[in-house]
Design a protein with these regions (language model features):
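Primarily the internal scaffold of c-type cytochrome electron-transfer domains
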Residues: 1-64, 68-196
């Protein structure tokens, strides 16, 4: 089922709320028993959803950045149908240089910030999962349900960034915002299970 009623609903929070309300799960985590969701490569949602990326706000499309201008034999101009990394195509980079003095360097920085944080939070998420798996049989039902919901939410926010494929480059602010939400969930989970964050 499509959870969207418009671009404003294309956010990790709105998607999570939609599936929470439905009680939907993609699978049950084998170690914790948490009802899990799988983010499904949310490139479009990351660029156009919610508050939108800065490039989407300016009217740029996927083709503007990833499909180089080309010319047919008769001189007709069109966008190539070959999807490329924009930093590896001189024709695309030429269009970008008016606003971006060092786009390749900026992308590397965004991606490093995002992947470093993904790895840091993955380790914290893994520790939370292991602790929850160890404690689940000794927790009362309400605490167990809360701990599982935290696992579901933290992993979904993390996964939303992890599987988006741009490593933060499509919308660096949103990537960090979703990783912040993952971290907030984990802090609550660590406190709930008496773990040191």
């Amino acid at each position: 089922t499509n959870p969207y009623t418009g671009l404003e609903g294309m956010t990790a929070e709105a998607i999570l709320a939609y599936y929470d309300e439905m009680g939907f799960k993609d699978w049950e985590h084998t170690e914790t028993g948490a009802p899990m969701l799988k983010a499904q490569h949310p490139e479009f949602e990351t660029i156009y959803g919610g508050a939108q990326s800065s490039m989407a706000k300016q009217g740029y499309t996927c083709a503007d950045c990833h499909m180089a201008p080309a010319k047919a034999e008769d001189g007709t101009e069109y966008s190539s149908h070959n999807l490329v990394n924009p930093t590896e195509d001189p024709a695309i980079m030429e269009k970008c240089e008016g606003c971006h003095a060092d786009l390749p360097g900026q992308i590397v920085q965004w991606q490093k910030e995002t992947t470093d944080r993904e790895h840091e939070l993955a380790a914290k998420l893994d520790a939370y999962i292991k602790t929850l798996a160890e404690q689940k049989d000794s927790l009362d039902e309400a605490t167990l349900e809360q701990a599982r919901q935290i696992h579901r939410h933290a992993q979904f926010y993390w996964d939303y960034v992890m599987v988006e494929n741009s490593e933060g480059a499509h919308n660096p602010g949103l990537a960090q915002e979703n990783l912040d939400k993952c971290e907030d969930e984990l802090k609550a989970g660590y406190a709930l299970l008496n773990m040191t964050y």
